[in-house]
Structure formats: C-alpha cells, structure tokens
Amino acid sequence: MSKSEVLRKDLESKSILKVGGAFDAMSAKLVENAGFDAVWAGSFAISATHALPDASILTMTEFFDAASSMSSTCEIPIIADCDTGYGGPSNVRHMVQKYENAGISSICIEDKTFPKQNSLLE
C-alpha cells in the first residue's frame, strides 16, 4: 500500500490523526519514531531553518527539496504545506506533479494571494 493510500485509509478510519511537524529529514524521522501517523512538512518550520519568515521568500524548489528528503527517509505519509501554490494554475499543476512523483502523500494549499503573509500575523 502506498503512503498516499495509507493516509487516505487513516483519514477515513481514525477519529484523530496524529501529525507531527518537521523541517528536514532528521526531524521527520524523529516524528516517525515517536509514533505519529504522518509528518507535516510545514513552510513555517522550513523557512525558519533558513532564518527567514514564512512569507513566500523560499522557492517551490527549496520547499520541495525539504519535503522530498522527508519522504525518502520516512515510511509514514508526508503532508506538505505548499503555501499559495507557487503561482498560477500552470505552476500549481507543475508543483502537484513534482510532489506526487516524489511520493509526497498530500499537499495543503492556502487560499491566499501571493506573496503570502504568515497566518499567525493575521
């Protein structure tokens, strides 16, 4: 069963899904070893590893590289925070294909305009 299928099954069968946040492959592995159901590859945490605010400063490639390394390291599903989708419809389509091909189980796209303002500031 693929990690995406595991995530879908868990979402349908569990009343609560335990998802732990990570910012790189090592922290994702710690989340997995702690018994969480999935890893949240959050843009806030990934931005923080570069000493940057979560404000659309990093590129899709930088976020993708972090999430992809988590996926290749862990056996549990990765849920990737993809901010506002990194552009228009063509960008979103490209992003979805890359993340899917890398084995990322799910993505989250915020309904905000680019450049995004961190949700904690609103």
Segments (PLM) and residue ranges:
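Alpha-helix-loop-beta-strand connector modules within alpha/beta enzyme cores
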Residues: 3-9, 13, 52-80, 102, ...
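Structural preference for beta-strand elements that scaffold enzyme active sites
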Residues: 17-19, 38, 77-79, 106-108
